[in-house]
Amino acid sequence: MKRTKTFKLTLGGICLALTIIFIYAGSFVPGIELTLFALSSLFTAVMILETGLGGGILLYLAASVLGLIIVPGKLAITPYICLFGYYGIVKYLIEKIPNAIAQITVKVLFFAALLCLGLLGFRELLLGSIDIPDYPVIILIAGGTVMMMLYDYIYTLVINFYIRRFQKKGIDSMKLS
């Protein structure tokens, strides 16, 4: 099915609205903030699947700017801007690597670097309101990386469900592309 400009524009508007709803809810619903941010990130993948990489990037940028305008607590949107919002884009690019072992290695290094930066460089800014156990940083990074790989796996399952259910295409692999 050929995607018209009207279809792409409409889909972008719907994905942007849903993304903002999840970001906004994540900013004030206690206990499930990260779940809501993770759900908000799925719409970037939908845009990439339906319109290409440019559509996913545009959605991320629009949601980040609109979120900063709409969400009352500006720090509440930080997890979306710093990780969840662009993860679909990163996943798409990493999964273009032909070797599965290399893909996993790059993802682990990406998550570890991001967690290291967050825990060592910007702990108060990014995690100020989140209680983190007083474990050595290396254990927190290792545990966080395992959790992010689980997030990546679930993200892949949801993408595959979307493709089978809404695009009605076969799946040959667990790739976003």
Where are these regions (language model features)?
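Membrane-helix interface "capping/anchor" motifs
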Residues: 47-58, 95-101
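Hydrophobic alpha-helical transmembrane segments
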Residues: 9-13, 35, 57-61, 78, ...
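Short helix-perturbing small/polar motifs within transmembrane alpha-helices
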Residues: 81-116, 120
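Mid-bilayer segments of alpha-helical transmembrane spans in multi-pass integral membrane proteins
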Residues: 73, 108-124, 145-153
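Membrane-interface helix termini and inter-helical loops of multi-pass transporters
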Residues: 123-136
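Interfacial aromatic-anchored transmembrane helix boundaries in multi-pass membrane proteins
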Residues: 24-33, 64-93
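Hydrophobic transmembrane alpha-helices
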Residues: 2-47, 55
